[in-house]
Amino acid sequence: MFPMVTGFMNYGQQTVRAARYIGQSFMITLSHANRLPVTIQYPYEKSITSERFRGRIHFEFDKCIACEVCVRVCPIDLPVVHWRLETDIRKKRLLNYSIDFGICIFCGNCVEYCPTNCLSMTEEYELSAYNRHELNYNQIALGRLPMSVIEDYTIRTTRNSTQIKIAMDKPLNARTVTNF
């Protein structure tokens, strides 16, 4: 009879422990019920990228001295630099510069080690293309600055925080940007 009593006590302790775990899980669920949704509707909503976001590389042709430091520090030797030595002034003259973003791993080494700061990272991340050869950007394509998400007049920017609630009952006629 004594083992039966200890069996009931163990059963009771396990029941109390299970109820406590269920209660803790329910409290976590309730704490998340008040938050805004994390998912964004991509074509109409865009997240504002951080200041240190590593997007497409911007290249300034006039600043480049064709030193090829970017090629040497790139883990995959990606930037293609064509130059010619000007014998009368004993300097290199840049002829062509290109980066294939289909291969680029966006490590940022080329931007970090460039001595003249002719390379910089932009906030552009929409680089998809139907043909992989379209991802090979020359110096003209690299020189274009992308339109900032904040400056885009077709997108309405909103901040995602617990203090500011997005009104779900208002119809959205513009695209929305969410800041994380």
Curated annotation (Swiss-Prot):
For the ligand ([4Fe-4S] cluster 1), the binding residues are C64, C67, C70, C114
Q: InterPro entries from the xrefs?
A: 4Fe4S_Fe-S-bd, 4Fe4S_Fe_S_CS, NADH_quinone_OxRdtase_chainI, NDHI
Q: Which species is the source of this protein?
A: Calycanthus floridus var. glaucus (Eastern sweetshrub)
- In Gene Ontology terms, what is a biological process of this protein? photosynthesis, light reaction
Keyword Ion transport part of the UniProt annotation: no
Q: Which residues bind [4Fe-4S] cluster 2?
A: C74, C104, C107, C110
Q: What is its main location?
A: plastid
**Name the UniProt record assigns to this protein:** NAD(P)H-quinone oxidoreductase subunit I, chloroplastic
Q: How would you describe this protein's topology in the membrane?
A: Peripheral membrane protein
One GO CC term, this protein = chloroplast thylakoid membrane
E.C. designation(s) = 7.1.1.-
For this protein, what does the record note about how its cofactor is bound?
Answer: Binds 2 [4Fe-4S] clusters per subunit.
Q: Which SUPFAM superfamilies match?
A: 4Fe-4S ferredoxins (SSF54862)
- Single GO term (MF): quinone binding
